[in-house]
Amino acid sequence: LAAQTRLLLRKAIAAYAGRDAADRLREAEARLDDPLRVAIAGKVKAGKSTLLNALIGDELAPTDAGDCTKIVAWYTNGNTYRATLYPSGAEPRQTPFSRDQGAIEVDLQGLDPGDIDRIVIEWPSASLAEMTLIDTPGLASVNEEISKRTEDFLAFEHDRDTPADAVLYLMRHFHRSDARFLEAFHAEELAHPSPVNAIAILSRADELGSGRPDALESAQRVANRYRGDARVRRLCQTVLPVAGLLAQSGATLREVEYQALAALAAL
């Protein structure tokens, strides 16, 4: 299928030679060789960064309310450890970063988060070799400018392709505002994420019902109900319950922590 797609794109590039469309087609061909780009979106405190850390298998993305969570952040596989700032209307620049037994702290070099288009974190990782993960600022933020950065990144109501190949949309419950957001992916143009590559995540599933022992089972039933709802089905491929913090803890479990759990289980 990839070979057929490449051949079709090359024919289209030749047919549209000299037009603006040819550049977009060349970009599409180049992306065939890149890892899948998956954007993670959702409201503030939905658990986006926690899920991203679980998918990477390492605690890289900050989960607090610091400046870095107000900027679109790309996490991509690299041969070395590097952070690059992409200021709006200026040349990209490498920047120092620190990591003290936790998330990466990037030096913004005195720039306001609103003046930075994106941060790219290169990190040697088998998980990131398969897909580039994109953490986006929270929607429905008190600061509308922060939410707008995510909307602009995903190319809502703009005549350009979104940089994301697929979108994971995190929600606690399916509200009208969630439907409006997912409808933005239901574009007629194939270049935009559609229900085929938009997945709804019922996040923080272990907290359902005030964290009852059967919370995960309850979350699965809720997800099943949403999957059977025609209004939801037309907006996303499926709905999956996820306990992001549990997944992150499992993916980043250290040997000493495993031994402690094994000792407790033996009591």
Give the role of each language-model region.
Residues 1-16:
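Charged, amphipathic alpha-helical linker segments immediately N-terminal to NTP-binding catalytic cores
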Residues 15-35:
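Long amphipathic alpha-helical scaffold segments
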Residues 28-267:
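Globular "head" domains of long coiled-coil molecular machines
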